[in-house]
Amino acid sequence: MYEYCSVIIKKYSRYTIPSLAPKGFSSVLEPPHIDKWQHLSVNCTLQFKVLLEDSGQVALQVILNNSTFLEHIRLPLGSNHDSIQFSCKCPIISCKYISEEFGPKVLKRFQINLSNEMDFNRIVISLKNLSFIVKTAKTSIARNTMINQTSDFSNSKKGNFNENNNAGTYRNSSVQFQTQNMVMDFSQIYQEKCARELNNCSNITFPMTNLPMTQQNFPTPEANVEHFSQDLNTPSATQTIPIAPEPLSVKLLEASPPLSNKSRHSPTTKKENRNTAISFDLLSKKGAILHNGNDTLNVADLPKKRQSTEDLVQIRSSANVVTTLGTSCNLVKKNATKQNKEKVDNKLSDSQNVAHTNEYQKKKEIPLCGPINGLETKMTLIQEEMMAAKKTSRDPPRKISKRLIKEKLKDEEFMKWVNKVERVLSKMFEK
């Protein structure tokens, strides 16, 4: 094995997704995507080698740290036009080749970036000597897109004003302008073209009308952005300009009074309300002057005050309606809860109520011996009734518990009442 050429590489790039190519290079393929490239250039030593084997084959290798093979291609010498192709533009060499390792034909790509022009020329000459196809990268697409972009930019700048002969020299120079490295980002090329335009177009006469000049921000050449394509052509750059969202306009809607209030009020009541509102305004106005003889009023801005008072009356009426509705709802809820509690309490305290009623009836049936005794008995009865009412109102509703059931079972009057109820129910069922 003979080492024909060996060069240190500055950067190695590989396309991660191989493309199916059943017809080889003549098959229809999708253009490579920029996001699918992997790069290797930092904290490592990369080397590209061209080796000649004794069997008459050529081996192309990309070696990492003198140990691992990133690329290892073996081809027959002289008859390799249908299996591998190279395209170059200093200092980059791109390679695409057909591989059949896993069955179907697959197209793979990789690129190497060299540190200087001498190494670049060495590899190109050695590949051509070994009868490899080495093409120069086409720059027509990048140049045409660049000229179109710069012409659109100059047309938008011109507007309605005239240019001098410097613009003509700029057009001629734009055709002849070429960059050394065509793999660099299109935005950098565009930035250099704009700088030339500003230097050449120095004598431009502006009209009287003030044209709005927009300021464009271009990326700095220090940005590490790279674009790859099949023939080392730079794709057209597209710039998206974010649009600021419009501020939202929020309008507050005034609450209109309900229709029920309008239907309830009669025309006479409306007139009375208006009269009261006007009289209130007249009293509150400091500049009001009353003449007793003619009964005339000299008040400034009286219609404006009337409108404001009517609005206030409507708003207050609507607020009162809302508050009355809220209070009525709360009262209904409270009454419902009270009724439920009273039903439960009535079931538990029927015996107590019967006992209290019997005691009150006995006290009412006491004969009166005289006027003083009668008054005293009446006062005591009234006081006892008041105290009983207070107790019933203060006592919280009792809950059915084991303790309460035990107390009721010990109560003789309650048990007698239960026995009476059982007798009555048994008689009703017998009938």
Curated annotation (Swiss-Prot):
It is found in: Chromosome. It comes from the Eukaryota. Pfam families: Meiotic_rec114. The keyword Manganese does not apply. GO terms for cellular component: chromosome. One of its GO terms (biological process) is reciprocal meiotic recombination. Belongs to the REC114 family. Required for meiotic recombination events; not required for mitosis. This is Meiotic recombination protein REC114. It comes from Saccharomyces pastorianus. The lineage of its organism: Eukaryota, Fungi, Dikarya, Ascomycota, Saccharomycotina.
